[in-house]
Amino acid sequence: MGGKQSTAARSRGPFPGVSTDDSAVPPPGGAPHFGHYRTGGGAMGLRSRSVSSVAGMGMDPSTAGGVPFGLYTPASRGTGDSERAPGGGGSASDSTYAHGNGYQETGGGHHRDGMLYLGSRASLADALPLHIAPRWFSSHSGFKCPICSKSVASDEMEMHFIMCLSKPRLSYNDDVLTKDAGECVICLEELLQGDTIARLPCLCIYHKSCIDSWFEVNRSCPEHPAD
């Protein structure tokens, strides 16, 4: 008899594409449940999405079950590219995405195929595809040394500063040109006979006034910055 009543209660029919599984309805007073929304079968398979996994839906992150952020990798490539959230209500065989070792935080967030996402507080780099993120970090994590103007990796910053500050100031010998010597690469004007020049240890020559101004912001040879 109870079975007939249950059937009659659902006689109006479900919404198209929505599971009628009673387990998809959270129990009163219980923890939030991650229900399943089915996409009509076929190659697309099961589409699972957490109702508390999207920021901005009006749910309090502190009561949303602590949906974890981090790395999500596809366990099967046979399904579509739809969004899937961690902690689906189905069994392990129902879930096409497995949660890897990632950051554990509270709050809303979502993920896409092969992406690292840490929620609304994350930066652009956090949401980059995993195969692009290392290249992005390597090109953005360095800095330009204010002493020698060389680009230095972040993990070498301290050692580089010690070497730069302990390195003696580059010196030069002044002289007067006895003949024209081409172009000064600092001011891009000709080095003419009679000009006062500075000759560096690497034998590069510049106008003395030009190299003095250069050394105020950079302690290396303009043409040999690695020396």
From Swiss-Prot:
Region Disordered, residue ranges: 1-42, 68-105
Tissues expressing the protein: Expressed primarily in the nervous system, with expression higher in developing brain relative to adult. Expressed at low levels in testis and thymus.
Membrane topology: Peripheral membrane protein
CDD domains for the chain: mRING-CH-C4HC2H_ZNRF2
Keywords of the record: Cytoplasmic vesicle, Endosome, Lipoprotein, Lysosome, Membrane, Metal-binding, Myristate, Phosphoprotein, Synapse, Transferase, Ubl conjugation, Ubl conjugation pathway, Zinc, Zinc-finger
Record PTM Phosphotyrosine, positions in chain: Y103
The keyword Lipoprotein belongs to this UniProt entry's keyword annotation: yes
Localization of this protein: Endosome; Lysosome; Membrane; Cytoplasmic vesicle, Secretory vesicle, Synaptic vesicle membrane
CC per GO annotation: cytoplasm; cytosol; endosome; intracellular membrane-bounded organelle; lysosome; membrane; plasma membrane; synaptic vesicle membrane
Enzyme nomenclature, EC number: 2.3.2.27
Result after altering C184A: Loss of E3 activity
Cross-referenced PROSITE patterns: ZF_RING_2 (PS50089)
N-myristoyl glycine-type lipidated residues: G2
Effect noted on mutating S82A: Partial loss of binding to 14-3-3
Highest taxon, organism lineage: Eukaryota
Single annotated GO MF: ubiquitin protein ligase activity
Zinc finger annotations (RING-type) as residue ranges: 184-225
Function as written in the Swiss-Prot or TrEMBL entry: E3 ubiquitin-protein ligase that plays a role in different processes including cell differentiation, receptor recycling or regulation of inflammation. Mediates the ubiquitination of AKT1 and GLUL, thereby playing a role in neuron cells differentiation. Plays a role in the establishment and maintenance of neuronal transmission and plasticity. Regulates Schwann cells differentiation by mediating ubiquitination of GLUL.
Swiss-Prot/TrEMBL domain comment: The RING-type zinc finger domain is required for E3 ligase activity.
Name of the featured protein: E3 ubiquitin-protein ligase ZNRF1
Organism field: Homo sapiens (Human)
Gene responsible for this protein: ZNRF1
